[in-house]
Amino acid sequence: MCIEAMRTSRASRETAKVLQALSPPARRQTRSTSHSALLKGFAYNAGKTEADPDDGEDDGSSLTSVDTVDIEDILEPSAKRRKTKASSAAKTTSNSTRRTPEKKVEKLVKKENSQPKARRVPARKVKNEDGSFTVEAPSNWDAIYSIVKKMREDNPTAPVDTMGCAELYWRASSPRDRRFQTLIALMLSSQTKDTVTAVAMQRLHTELGEGGAPAIKLETEHAESIVKQEAENGEPAIKQEAKDGVPPANPSHDSTLNLENILAVSPERLNSLIGTVGFHNNKTKYIKKAAEIIRDQYNSDIPSTPAELMKLPGVGPKMAYLCMSAAWGKHEGIGVDVHVHRITNLWGWHKTKTPEETRMSLESWLPKDKWHEINKLLVGLGQTVCLPVGRRCGDCGLAGTKLCKSEIKGMAPKNNGRGLPKKEIVVETFSLTGEPKIKVEGE
């Protein structure tokens, strides 16, 4: 019995080993598989599923029926988290729906209230159909020009109005001498204030010749009638009174400033007479050399074209075109100085770097009937209101019109809108009547 029992147990153990070797290895039990099995037990159709008789023997077949998905996808969030997410989503939706129409309404209101602004456009070239180019004037230039012209006419207190180069010739001189005097005044005016130029011109009119000034040249019937009236009455036709102890000028003498006296005077003497102007040493050389050229090449009269005038030493485009207008009455170009160059750029008419560029730009579109007056117009504006430093925008007629792109807004008028206070300066530029002209300088 014992021997048979030992044989049976040994046989059973060997049989178990063989079966164990032939059967597949048991599947490893993990946390996810255990959770899946647990969830499978709570499935909706768990009670209706028939038990497989082989389930107990083969555990792997039951696990393969469960989808291998992440636990976060199977489990529903807790009530608190679900409520928080739902509320935040609702809040986001409500905020987005609340803000969107507000933005749209604001945009619509802005579009309705906004008015199209007039664009300020400078002078520009426009190509025509035939391939040629024309220059269109800046926008609103005529409105700016009209306002400034009216303002200057109502208050002509700038130094250029009474002491500009066009006003400094001797009224009783011959036309040839007056043209020469205008040229000399322009040559002296470079880098010099009008008041200083007027004083230097007065010295040349009265002190240039040696041994006294020559007798006056009577060239008009008006002058002859004045002399005849003086001879009959035994006294001057127009009585003059001394001012500040200075006796009035004697109208019986002509100016000493003429070509012949400039040629005869020594450079040292001429330099002392014009010593108040800027760069007087260079100007002395230029005037002496120009006088020789006028005598030798132009029959003792100044040239009659801008190109010929610019051949004279010290004479540039500005002087040439101003001299053509004042001396010959020919307006062939615009005299552009620093005031014209600066102010037109402040207005946005163009973007130029030099006065010569400004001249060419203005001449391309400005009507020719304004070429002569624009210099005096803008120089006076630059001397009284639109100053190089410390512009008085409150005193300008363009204030508040939105026409000047460089206006300093909020500036109150410094003189109640009446321009600058007047200061009287007596400069004897003796006319035929012998009355000294009263010059007005704005402080």
Swiss-Prot record:
Alphabetized UniProt keyword annotations: 4Fe-4S, DNA damage, DNA repair, Glycosidase, Hydrolase, Iron, Iron-sulfur, Lyase, Metal-binding, Mitochondrion, Nucleus, Transit peptide
PROSITE patterns: ENDONUCLEASE_III_2
Keyword Cell cycle: no
GO cellular component, one term: mitochondrion
UniProt-listed Gene3D superfamilies: Helix-hairpin-Helix base-excision DNA repair enzymes (C-terminal), Hypothetical protein, domain 2
Transit peptide: 1-40
UniProt catalytic activity: 2'-deoxyribonucleotide-(2'-deoxyribose 5'-phosphate)-2'-deoxyribonucleotide-DNA = a 3'-end 2'-deoxyribonucleotide-(2,3-dehydro-2,3-deoxyribose 5'-phosphate)-DNA + a 5'-end 5'-phospho-2'-deoxyribonucleoside-DNA + H(+)
Domain HhH, residue spans: 297-321
Region called Disordered, residue ranges: 1-126
Site (Important for catalytic activity): 337
Alphabetized Pfam families for the sequence: HHH (PF00633), HhH-GPD (PF00730)
Cellular location(s): Nucleus; Mitochondrion
GO molecular function, one term: metal ion binding
Cofactor stoichiometry and binding remark: Binds 1 [4Fe-4S] cluster. The cluster does not appear to play a role in catalysis, but is probably involved in the proper positioning of the enzyme along the DNA strand.
Active-site annotation: 318 (nucleophile)
EC number: 3.2.2.-, 4.2.99.18
GO biological process, one term: base-excision repair, AP site formation
UniProt-annotated binding residues for [4Fe-4S] cluster: 386, 393, 396, 404
Composition bias, Low complexity: 86-98
Cofactor: [4Fe-4S] cluster
InterPro entries: DNA_glycosylase, Endonuclease-III-like_CS2, HhH-GPD_domain, HhH_base_excis_C, HhH_motif, NTH1
Function: Bifunctional DNA N-glycosylase with associated apurinic/apyrimidinic (AP) lyase function that catalyzes the first step in base excision repair (BER), the primary repair pathway for the repair of oxidative DNA damage. The DNA N-glycosylase activity releases the damaged DNA base from DNA by cleaving the N-glycosidic bond, leaving an AP site. The AP lyase activity cleaves the phosphodiester bond 3' to the AP site by a beta-elimination. Primarily recognizes and repairs oxidative base damage of pyrimidines.
Family: Belongs to the Nth/MutY family.
UniProt-listed HAMAP family: Endonuclease_III_Nth
Protein name: Endonuclease III homolog
Organism listed in the record: Emericella nidulans (strain FGSC A4 / ATCC 38163 / CBS 112.46 / NRRL 194 / M139)
